[in-house]
Structure formats: C-alpha cells, structure tokens
Amino acid sequence: MPRNAVNKSINTYSYDEVLKKSIAYFQGDELAASTWMNKYAMKDKKNNFLECTPDEMHWRMAKQFARKEKEYKLKSHSNASFKYLSKYGQERELLDEKKIFHYFKNFKYIIPQGSVMSSLGNPNIIASLSNCIVLPEIYDSYGGIFHTDQQLAQLFKRRCGVGIDISTLRPAGMLVSNAAGTTTGAVSFMERFSNTTREVAQNGRRGALMITIDIAHPDVEQFITVKQDLSKVTGANISIRLSDEFMNAVANDSNFTLRWP
C-alpha cells in the first residue's frame, strides 16, 4: 500500500479538540493539559495532533513495551537477551499491552521520563529515549576529537544531554607528531565542544553538555579558570573529578602530583 494511503487513515485532532479533552482528563488543570499537549502529545510532521489525551499516549507506549516483552518470551539461557535480565526479570511474569497500560494509566504507578513519553513509538521525530548520555573516553588524536564532536551533534539533534571527560587528551606543551610539534592541551578543545552544544538546537532549545577532567590532569588549573572569561565555553557546564588520593592529600596537608596519563 502506498505511504500516502496509510497516512490518510490516521486520525488527526484539532488544537481546540485536544485542549478540551486534555483539560477534562486533567480535571480542569489547564497548565497540565497545555504541558502535555506541547511536550508529549504525538504530532505528525505538519504539527497536527495524532493523540487527543494521555490515554492514547499511554497505549502507544504500552504497545512498544509489550513488543519488547515478547523478545523475552522464550525464557531460556539460549535466548541472547535473557542473560542480561536480573534474577527478578528472569522469573517474573511477562506483561502484555493491557497490563502495561494499567501501570501507566492516569500517571498513577509509573511516570516515564519525558523523552520516553514524547518519542517512544513516535515515527515522526528523530529522538533518543535517554535524557542523558555519557560518552566513552575521547581518543587522543584529532580524529578522536572530531569523532566525539560529531557524536555530540548527533545526540543533541536527538535532544540528549551529554557528558564527556577530557582527561584522556594530553596536556598543553606535550610533543605530538604533527607539524605543530606540541599540543595546545585538553582545555583548548573545550570551546569546540561548547560551540557544537550552542549551535545544535531543537525547538529553540540548545543542547546540554557537561565537561569533566580528572583532578590529576596537568591542565586542571587552566580548566578551573577557563570560564573566568565570560566569553569562553558558554555552552557547557564544567566539573572536576576528585579522587580519594587527592582528598587524602588535602586531609593530610601533603603534596599531590599532577600527571598524564
């Protein structure tokens, strides 16, 4: 069947119709109704409403969770997915669509995070089901740095908040094999990551980035002070990863050696 024939059978709702029914659903709470409409109700690519109340959203999610439940139907160690379940997960009764909907209904027992409510089972948007993701360590090369930058752009496009750690990048002044001879250091690449965060926006909302560095990294002092210049790294929050070794040195008023790697 042609794609356009499928689309013609999909019900759409007017804004006023959805507003009226969602206000009734939330027992007169207009703020709750408008929040649900703006953030979580499924819409098509022309911004037409495809869901009229949270019940329809909950059925959409229940259908997708039930689909995943069926993957574990064969309760056997020969099932590759089975071994990743907890003991409870291996032994519990499988849930069907109706039972899952019961847990979602009226937001009584389970309220998923926002990205799940807006994105799960929604074919009209490209989005992640995780609100936040921590990327693996950055490979210490230009290729590795640009790869991480590309990952950031793709994740921000999908409305994820992202955390990265730059401790694997060599400190300023160390020898490198390129024409420059020495590296500008880990902190110098923060601006690139920050700019990507600001530039990739969804619905007027920029991405969210956390950059961390180990307290033992030789560039840590530069990292700490980089945002004293209010024009620098404006698209990211920054934090130091403290170690027991450092905290013991503080407690004992002893020396602490910076090092890389």
Predicted regions and their residues:
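Extended catalytic cores of very large enzyme megasubunits
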Residues: 1-261
